Amino acid sequence: MPLTVKCPICKTPVEWAPQSEFKPFCSERCKLIDLGDWASEKHAIPVKSEFDLDALDEFDLDEDAFFKE
């Protein structure tokens, strides 16, 4: 029995099988809607900042004198 999932866009059941051309989407239309959502940044993967913004004050980087010659 093949696995069935819901299309992330319209919730139509989709068979998860090699012949399912647009899986996990039910159609090219739903696939393109999802792509458009990513392109317009409606979806985003949360990212942890490389820098600890609280630690910047430790080096007085927010002081005006730091940026003056």
Swiss-Prot record:
Name of protein: DNA gyrase inhibitor YacG
Family indicated by similarity: Belongs to the DNA gyrase inhibitor YacG family.
One Gene Ontology MF term: zinc ion binding
Subunit structure: Interacts with GyrB.
Record note on cofactor: Binds 1 zinc ion.
SUPFAM superfamilies: Glucocorticoid receptor-like (DNA-binding domain) (SSF57716)
Gene: yacG
Residues that bind Zn(2+): 7, 10, 26, 30
Top-level division of the source organism's lineage: Bacteria
Cofactor(s), by name: Zn(2+)
Coiled-coil boundaries: none
PANTHER family per the UniProt record, alphabetical: DNA GYRASE INHIBITOR YACG (PTHR36150:SF1)
